[in-house]
Amino acid sequence: MNAPDLTRPPLTIRRISLDTGRENVAVISRRSRALRPEVFRGFSRVELRINSKVLLATLMITDDDAMIGPDEVGLSEPAFRRFNEPVGSAVSVTPARSPASLDAVRAKIQGHTLSAAEITAIVDDLAHFRYSDMEIAAFLISAARFTTTDELLALVGAMASVGTKLTWDTPIVVDKHCIGGIPGNRTTMIVVPIVAAHGLMIPKTSSRAITSPAGTADTMELLARVDLDVEQMKQVVHACGGCLVWGGHVNLSPADDILISVERPLSLDTPEQMVASIMSKKLAAGSTRLLIDFPVGPSAKVTSANEAMRLRKLFEFVGDHFGISVEVVTTDGRQPIGRGIGPVLEARDVMAVLGNKPGAPADLREKSLRLAAHLLEYDPKLRGGTGYARAKELLDSGAALKKMQQIIDAQGPSPCPAELGSYAADVLAAADGVVNGIDCLRINRLARSAGAPVAKGAGIDLFKKIGDRVEKGEPLYRVYASDRSEFDLALAAAQAESGFAINHHTPADVDLVS
């Protein structure tokens, strides 16, 4: 019996205004002359080819000829951008072979340990968009069951080697990272100018928010451009000693961004996956000294000292293997840090601290100073134990603010208006007493439901923190939104459950940084 003829008449490219995340999607008509029902099915993988240029995509089939004609193939926005061919170009569409590395994923599902070569092949296919989201999920779930230390090291190395790898002309390149989960907590934007003002190099790449109301990049974008390419980033670092840019535009460890896009909806966040994600980016960034902030609290990502210790050892193990000196500090994760939650409000807090303004959040200032102190003591010229005094000197003197302004000027003007949302209302205490707890997850969700971080001026402005005495009817915080429907949704949710625990017990003091 002869094999079926898989040759097809070419189709012409049509751009579809469809955001499919990071997945390439191709859409063809059920009446397409190129469609063979016995070969093509919805959600199968197809190969689009123009000469030597190839794009793999997940296929979807439509009965709506107004959307896609019989002689067309529609490309989602990510697919159209990556293929980079003009609308109307003739393209062949054929069934795609599964990546050979999927055999290793199947082996992992069955409980086998993977070799470094197998992991490298998987990461290469991930980075080149050869996996569908379902295939990525299969890999993540198989790795979540168990990952050996050898597999972890291979994964970090492979992820760091795909994409941009930065090198610097100084032996000490410092960096900091917080594992997240705490609202506000915008310490990076204070630590970077302090450290750079001292003279240590700190080329900071940061993420945009995924599940939080703001990432460092979302907040910094209100002050300066963050979408710098590699050469622009290097120019800023050489001129200023540091930068605050969006890592997604620099293309560090692109496979990690692809994995994260599937991890988040599945709520997958194992210690090994967290370590691989963070360390692959730091390795690619050329960091030699790394400070990691572990907030510990009942609604933080790390909820106990034992959990923090295990994660710390894993980070240090990977750092030792790749020549990165890793220091882990545990911090108070019981409540938000700073007053503002959401890009505009967080930028306000940062500039208040850098400007030494009356009323600047004391907890944000103190935590930033302590974290900066750890990084400054990587300088061999600085006497041990004097990092905090030096950090305080740089902040109090205005040197850190001056350095921040230099970084802002070098990165270029912000494209975003720094305006608070036009809708605002206070959420009130339901009883007299003392604030005994704040649910960080709840506060994050409320700020996001108000529109943050997409709406830069949306979020929550806190008036009370743990240990504060409140009276019934007194404002706990203010909700801001730029859209009426989002405002109504967030306010109703906050009034139903504020996220504040109020009783008559005095909470225990916890050190900000230990």
From Swiss-Prot:
Catalysed reactions listed for this entry: thymidine + phosphate = 2-deoxy-alpha-D-ribose 1-phosphate + thymine
Coiled coil ranges: none
Cellular component annotations (GO), alphabetically ordered: cytosol
Protein name in UniProt: Putative thymidine phosphorylase
Top-level enzyme category: transferase
UniProt keyword Glycosyltransferase present: yes
Single GO biological process annotation from the record: pyrimidine nucleoside metabolic process
Family from the record: Belongs to the thymidine/pyrimidine-nucleoside phosphorylase family. Type 2 subfamily.
PROSITE patterns referenced in this protein's UniProt entry, alphabetically: THYMID_PHOSPHORYLASE
Keywords, comma-separated and alphabetical: Glycosyltransferase, Transferase
Record lineage: Bacteria, Pseudomonadati, Pseudomonadota, Alphaproteobacteria, Hyphomicrobiales
Transferase listed as a keyword: yes
Recorded GO MF terms: 1,4-alpha-oligoglucan phosphorylase activity; thymidine phosphorylase activity
EC numbers, comma separated: 2.4.2.4
